[in-house]
Amino acid sequence: DYDYMTSEIDSLIPTSYTINNDTYALVIGNQNYRFVPGVPYAIHDARVFKEYCEKTLGIPSENIHLVEDGTKAMINEEEFQWLENISNRENKKLIVYYAGHGVPDTKDRNKAYMLPTDVRGTKPQNGISLNDFYGRIGDLAFEQTSVFLDACFSGINRDNESVNEGMRGTE
């Protein structure tokens, strides 16, 4: 695990007295990866984002799904099933937050992927394509959707280690 340094932004979360029953949030924090170096603080950041959703945005906790160390199946199947089961989506809002590895496609610079915790960095195409992810989110037809990606998509982590095994970063 990581030694967390907290700041005021983590603890002095503004509180609103508004309740937004028609807003939902899918919050994903991928920190501990099976095949590639981890993403320090991703779970912590996801938990803090969830807390902001509850306290500041007034989203009821039952309208928020927090996924920690999400596998491809968890994200593609379980979480999208949860979103699909929300009725009257055309009158509701969705917020999606992802903290974790983003991986570029080494063959096509116009493609990028979110890396679930059970996918190898050598085959980013086995991850979750951003184009497909945005398409699926759009097909859900919420009234409004906001997506926050806390991922760099360079293929290199903070320690200059490659997420795409067999490659390394340069300075």
Language model features by range: what are they?
Residues 1-112:
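Boundary/activation segment at the start of structured domains
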Residues 165-171:
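Short, intrinsically disordered, charge-balanced linker/junction segments flanking boundaries
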Residues 22, 76-99, 103-162:
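Caspase-like (clan CD) cysteine peptidase catalytic core
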Residues 8-13, 131-132, 170:
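Alpha-helical scaffolding within the catalytic cores
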